[in-house]
Amino acid sequence: MNIQTTVEPTSAERAEKLQGMGCKRKRVEDIRFTQGKGNYVDDVKLPGMLFGDFVRSSHAHARIKSIDTSKAKALPGVFAVLTAADLKPLNLHYMPTLAGDVQAVLADEKVLFQNQEVAFVVAKDRYVAADAIELVEVDYEPLPVLVDPFKAMEPDAPLLREDIKDKMTGAHGARKHHNHIFRWEIGDKEGTDATFAKAEVVSKDMFTYHRVHPSPLETCQCVASMDKIKGELTLWGTFQAPHVIRTVVSLISGLPEHKIHVIAPDIGGGFGNKVGAYSGYVCAVVASIVLGVPVKWVEDRMENLSTTSFARDYHMTTELAATKDGKILAMRCHVLADHGAFDACADPSKWPAGFMNICTGSYDMPVAHLAVDGVYTNKASGGVAYRCSFRVTEAVYAIERAIETLAQRLEMDSADLRIKNFIQPEQFPYMAPLGWEYDSGNYPLAMKKAMDTVGYHQLRAEQKAKQEAFKRGETREIMGIGISFFTEIVGAGPSKNCDILGVSMFDSAEIRIHPTGSVIARMGTKSQGQGHETTYAQIIATELGIPADDIMIEEGNTDTAPYGLGTYGSRSTPTAGAATAVAARKIKAKAQMIAAHMLEVHEGDLEWDVDRFRVKGLPEKFKTMKELAWASYNSPPPNLEPGLEAVNYYDPPNMTYPFGAYFCIMDIDVDTGVAKTRRFYALDDCGTRINPMIIEGQVHGGLTEAFAVAMGQEIRYDEQGNVLGASFMDFFLPTAVETPKWETDYTVTPSPHHPIGAKGVGESPHVGGVPCFSNAVNDAYAFLNAGHIQMPHDAWRLWKVGEQLGLHV
């Protein structure tokens, strides 16, 4: 007689089956992407759809004397040619920016940067549209050009923004010059100045963080379709923040939000480039409303690099006051911020310079003062958070370079200087001198682990030997050791200090369990490659005990998703991830009531075990979450409404503060300027780790972009405002050939105020990577007394450094 018994899986076995938090779950979205079955904006094809293209200015600053569109309109296949004159009667010739400025949709009377939009041609296909734009005749009167932000603030500098020349008070106080945008100050100026006045050592440098540009695989694009019968507009687009775009379109067009349906399908990368609104979106909407047919706009790569939102262009005069033995007493920083022709920064309204006031970094100092002046120039507008959280990259670059130059002046090892000044674990939560309250951290532990792993002291000994060999003429190669210890600020953000256009920067999650136990969750964020469909499901799997494979995540549809502020600045996990956990716990609390009813016990007699509620002391008496889901729809307890679903709008109590220790070992040939990264080690602490494999992918991607920015990327202009490098022939994008090998590591310091302890990680490798590369280059040349070497550190610039130092024979 065979007796078969069923062995109940252990808690560990059931937890492993869930593929919840901490599991290296493969990205579920990659199945469609790797098979070429993604659904992108350019895949949207509608009956009768037309195509739009822009006539763009060849001048950086010029008055428009006339625009003749007659030849273009006469071309067969052309349906409309829109200019500012056509938009004015609709009050659509200007649009609000996320920074509170107004930006011309189509240039009105004069152009302010090269390739600015002048007219919008609508034709039967993109080829006819391209032909038509060549037939539009624009008569320009060139005006003096300003591309240097310092010259733009000189008393006799030409006026750029004639549309606001009489508005000398902005959202952040008085404008002290007609090209001035804002002056923003924070910190104890009096106390900081007093500390500097009596400091034993003052280290002062000017660090320029050059203009760069996010380079997503997919450019910005949209399809607008107006249903005149219903009075409803559907807008597909590459939107990192679909609900924000819906609000902006409503404000511009006058259409109520319930009549606007915004859909962000699959997006091929964003990196901050797709947060704001662009002229292409507005013109496509207007053309669809006027013509009554769908209109598609897709920008090309040149347009993307030269006209959509740039990043950086910060000129930072940074000072540290210290004792002779290396104790930092104060920081003073003044920034001249080049915002281009319009202030279109994607920053929270109350922070015109973003979170630049994180610039005191990971270091304990009593006082600090920061002042930022924004200025208009004849460049494309922007100032987006390119792989960072609102100017944090600039802030970290400033403090990490300043630490290095202070160490050189003190003749002190820069690692020792950092350790001497770290915020200590027992000081958390730590109130930084410029206002942020750091949540948690163990900086000494992370630094020690990193130094031990790379063999820091052995590397310094090797470097010393190579320097002596170089002086003896035995080698033409120098060695640099770059260090970056960064603290980032992400998770924007708390309603008390973060909003965009007046909308608080909460985020949201709506979770519904079906009768059979499967789940659908809708989020207010929008992935552009971050892997949300995988990681949000893992959070829910852990919280509710339902396998991640039974959970579907939806984003990007404003008709179905709860209102959210989108994905950028590493905010998805700190905000929407928290909302997901809280919504799941609401469901779990209701499920516990149902379990108590079914098991005929009090709720307090139950305990949670991976995927079930069981009676305390009687583990054989339990109800799984799937059983409870079925019961919730078919036999709920009396006076309890059916179903298991919840929504949460999460307003974070604070930001989260991921941190990391990065080391770069670099070898540079002084005769050619060619720099080779021998080793790059990145230790990140992002709090609770949801999916280690996705974290590693994020770190690899961020470091690759950091390598590109530090070692070659730059959007340059000549004196006439001509863009130099608006293609990938000139704008450096590293391939697998150039990209170094990345070595990743971690510590775990959970955020005490976040529901699952997570902090965010997507931006950290870029934030920490850029100064690490730059510090490696500067460290290599330091023994030759080269002084600060500005980025980007391409071979031509490093060859010039060697030439200036007299190293070439």
Curated annotation (Swiss-Prot):
Transmembrane segments: none annotated. Cu(+) binds at residue 388. GO terms for molecular function: anaerobic carbon-monoxide dehydrogenase activity; carbon-monoxide oxygenase activity; copper ion binding; iron ion binding; molybdenum ion binding. SUPFAM superfamilies: CO dehydrogenase molybdoprotein N-domain-like, Molybdenum cofactor-binding domain. Keywords: Copper, Metal-binding, Molybdenum, Oxidoreductase, Plasmid. Its EC number is 1.2.5.3. Binds 1 Cu(+) ion per subunit. SMART domains: Ald_Xan_dh_C (SM01008). InterPro entries: Ald_Oxase/Xan_DH_a/b (IPR000674), Ald_Oxase/Xan_DH_a/b_sf (IPR036856), Ald_Oxase/xanthine_DH-like (IPR016208), AldOxase/xan_DH_MoCoBD1 (IPR008274), AldOxase/xan_DH_MoCoBD2 (IPR046867), AldOxase/xan_DH_Mopterin-bd_sf (IPR037165), CO_Mo_DH_lsu (IPR012780). Catalyzes the oxidation of carbon monoxide to carbon dioxide. This is Carbon monoxide dehydrogenase large chain. It comes from Afipia carboxidovorans (strain ATCC 49405 / DSM 1227 / KCTC 32145 / OM5) (Oligotropha carboxidovorans). The lineage of its organism: Bacteria, Pseudomonadati, Pseudomonadota, Alphaproteobacteria, Hyphomicrobiales.
